[in-house]
Each structure stands twice: as structure tokens, then as C-alpha cells.
């Protein structure tokens, strides 16, 4: 589902939430690199110079934000910002050492005319990894197949939110729908899912959400889409016309069980990139944990990039800090429950995702009727370091 967000204005930073991580420490290092950090020991797990592209290109699906913290956390302090191309490039730094290659992080959204990440990956052969939602991977399976190699968030931060003053007895989406609320979204997938899971009347679906707050402020009877990592903070702290809490429930609780923005490769490049992925995937697993443990510097970079790109996307330090906290407190970034490994995919869950979303996408005409997808074609756990845990 295409992501949209309410415009954000400046706010005070929130307190950071500590998080302990479990993983191997940095490998013994040798010389100092251009980034000012020790260079990874040659041939070690953190030395990417002999196996990865000279510049590892990471493609996101939206503007700079804290949900993408693991990518931006890899960017060394020697970074440069291309304000015309909207990219940031620097030494790829992991666990305190320079890995011997550069990293370039590219945003999605208006910079690339809102094209999907899978489309961008097939247009630009230089992209190493892209953030491809599982439902998007299903949609593009026939023409632009991608294979996810690790997750970053375990559960989607997408929500439906409501006014607790209007619905004082409601604790779930189903409760609000039962009281006759109209569901305001920007697409058809969520309403179709709600029809199946909580009995939403199709007549109560409004897909004209435009990412602004005006409708919700004017009509607090609405049940509106948003992100747990943004809208609750924004509405309470940055929208003067509202200026109070909202209640919400995660869509993952009611069947929207995709992996959000897992890192994927083009299917036809998996073999070529295997030597790189054997080292890069564990680095990405640990990068998310390290970011959530201490998001301060990365959040500063994210806010700087949002300002520099000047696309109309405004992102405050307050939202960034709230997002990092919420990724932990709402259980969005957790170990895979089936294996206890952070970043690993659950085969049974992948089967459930295919079983849920193929019929929905067929009904919308996104997929032809009779589409058959083997879930194992959508992901691999081959490169996962099973010793890495967020607990």
C-alpha cells in the first residue's frame, strides 16, 4: 500500500529509550580509513571491500524517516549530500569500523515520481538492496521479482486511529467499526481486508485520504489510516487544531501481516550478490539493533536530509525520536517469534501472507485470476546470522 504522511512541523525531541542487543562485537581492526574510523580487518566479517560493490546502493520507498534508521545508521560521518539527486553517500560504517566500501541511501516518494521500489530496482541496475513490502513483492512477482533477504521491522507500523472522546468505550478497530465509523484510507487494500476480518460495510469505506489532518480534525468520527510511529505524536504535539491524544490499533493485529520494507534483491541478481550478502545481511540485522539502541546521531542525519532534499517533506526531531521509541515499545522491531532470530523470515507467516494477499490483489485486478505464488520465491534466510537477537 502506498505510504502517505501528514506534513510535520518542528517539535521538541522526546526522551530516548534504551535497548540492549546481543551480537558479536566489532572485529579486530587495523589502519584508519578515510572516515576517520578504524578499517575492518582484511577478510573479516565486516570487510566488504572484496565482496561488495564499491558503492552499496540502498533504495528506500519513502522520504527520510526513522523507520529507515538501519540504512541511514550505516552512513559514515564523511557523508556528502546531493541536493539535486536527493541522495546521501558516505563510507559504509558498521559496529564502529569502516567496511571498505561506500554506501548510498536513496529515498522514495516524489524523488522518483512515486514509483515502486521493485520498479526502480529493475530500472537501475546499480541498486544493491531495496525496501520492498511483501504485498508489493507479490504484486510485482510476475514482471519484477524480488527476493527479501532480511527484515528490519518485524511488524507493520500502519494503524487505524480514532478520537477517544468520540469513541470512549472503543479499544479496537472492530469496536469503532461496530459503532458505524467511516474508514478513511488512501487505497483499497485495507478496506478489503477489513471487510473480511472485522465485517466492514463497503459503504463505510472512503479511499480519498490525502495525508492531511483537515478531515479528521473537522470530523472526529472518522477511523483514519496512519502510522504508529508518527501520527499519534504529530496529532498530539504538532497539530494545533487537534492538540490531544488519539487512540489506535495496529493493522497487523487484524490481518495486515506483511513484512514492512524488508530488504530485497532482484531475483536475477541473487547469485551474483551472494558473496556480498553473506556479509552485508548480518550487518543490516545488527544495524537496526544498534540504531534503536542509540538513534540520536542517525536521527539528526535523517532530519538534515529531509531539510536538504526540499521536496515538501518536513520531519522533526520530535517525530524521529518518538518513532525510534515506538518501534520498540509497540513491538514492531522484535525477534522473529518462530525462531528467536532478529531479521529472519517465518515460512508459515510468508505462506499466510500469500494466502491473504493474492486473493485481495486478484479482486482488485492487480494480479490476474488464478495467480499461483510459491512463498519460498519471495524470500530467503540463507544469509541470516542466527546468533543476532534484539533481546
Task: For each feature predicted by the language model, list its residue ranges.
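Sec-dependent bacterial lipoprotein signal peptides
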Residues: 1-20
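Bacterial lipoprotein signal-peptidase II cleavage site
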Residues: 19-37
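Short, glycine-/small- and polar/acidic-enriched structural segments
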Residues: 31-209
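Short, solvent-exposed loop/beta-turn-alpha elements that line the ligand-binding surface or hinge
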Residues: 79-98, 180, 250-256, 271, ...
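Pocket-lining segment of extracytoplasmic ligand-binding domains
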Residues: 135-136, 210-214, 219-310
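Small-molecule pocket liners
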Residues: 154-160, 164, 259-263, 268, ...
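Secondary-structure end/capping motifs
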Residues: 273-364
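Conserved C-terminal helix/tail region of periplasmic/extracytoplasmic solute-binding proteins
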Residues: 347-391
Amino acid at each position: 500500500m502506498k505510504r502517505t504522511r501528514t506534513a510535520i512541523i518542528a517539535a521538541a525531541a522526546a526522551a530516548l529509550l534504551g535497548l540492549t542487543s546481543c551480537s558479536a562485537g566489532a572485529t579486530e581492526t587495523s589502519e584508519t580509513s578515510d572516515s576517520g574510523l578504524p578499517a575492518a580487518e582484511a577478510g573479516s566479517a565486516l570487510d566488504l571491500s572484496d565482496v561488495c560493490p564499491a558503492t552499496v546502493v540502498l533504495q528506500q520507498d519513502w522520504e527520510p524517516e526513522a523507520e529507515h534508521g538501519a540504512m541511514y545508521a550505516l552512513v559514515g560521518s564523511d557523508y556528502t549530500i546531493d541536493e539535486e539527486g536527493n541522495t546521501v553517500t558516505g563510507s559504509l560504517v558498521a559496529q564502529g569500523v569502516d567496511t571498505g566500501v561506500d554506501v548510498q541511501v536513496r529515498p522514495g516518494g516524489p524523488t522518483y515520481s512515486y514509483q515502486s521500489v521493485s520498479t526502480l530496482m529493475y530500472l537501475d541496475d546499480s541498486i544493491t538492496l531495496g525496501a520492498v513490502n511483501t504485498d508489493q513483492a507479490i504484486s510485482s512477482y510476475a514482471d519484477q521479482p524480488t527476493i527479501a533477504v532480511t527484515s528490519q521491522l518485524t511488524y507493520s507500523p500502519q494503524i487505524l486511529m480514532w478520537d477517544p472522546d468520540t469513541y470512549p468505550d472503543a479499544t479496537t478497530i472492530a469496536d469503532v467499526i461496530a459503532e458505524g465509523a467511516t474508514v478513511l484510507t488512501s487505497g483499497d487494500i485495507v478496506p478489503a481486508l477489513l471487510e473480511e476480518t472485522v465485517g466492514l460495510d463497503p459503504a463505510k469505506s472512503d479511499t480519498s485520504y490525502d495525508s492531511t489532518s483537515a478531515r479528521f480534525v473537522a470530523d472526529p468520527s472518522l477511523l483514519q489510516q496512519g502510522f504508529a510511529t508518527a501520527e499519534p505524536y504529530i496529532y498530539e504535539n504538532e497539530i494545533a487544531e487537534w492538540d490531544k491524544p488519539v487512540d489506535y490499533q495496529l493493522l497487523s493485529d487484524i490481518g495486515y501481516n506483511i513484512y514492512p520494507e524488508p530488504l530485497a534483491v532482484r531475483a536475477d541478481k541473487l547469485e551474483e550478490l551472494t558473496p556480498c550478502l553473506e556479509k552485508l545481511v548480518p550487518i543490516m540485522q545488527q544495524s537496526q539493533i544498534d540504531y534503536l539502541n542509540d538513534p540520536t546521531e542517525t536521527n539528526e542525519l535523517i532530519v538534515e536530509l529531509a531539510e536538504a532534499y526540499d521536496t515538501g517533506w518536513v520531519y522533526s526531531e520530535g517525530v524521529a525520536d518518538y518513532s525510534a521509541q515506538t518501534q520498540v515499545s509497540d513491538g514492531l522491531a522484535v525477534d522473529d517469534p518462530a525462531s528467536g532470530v532478529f531479521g529472519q523470515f517465518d515460512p508459515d507467516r510468508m505462506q499466510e501472507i500469500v494466502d491473504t494477499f493474492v486473493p485481495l490483489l486478484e479482486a482488485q485486478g492487480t494480479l490476474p485470476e488464478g495467480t499461483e505464488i510459491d512463498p519460498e520465491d519471495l524470500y530467503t534466510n540463507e544469509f541470516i546470522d542466527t546468533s543476532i537477537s534484539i533481546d
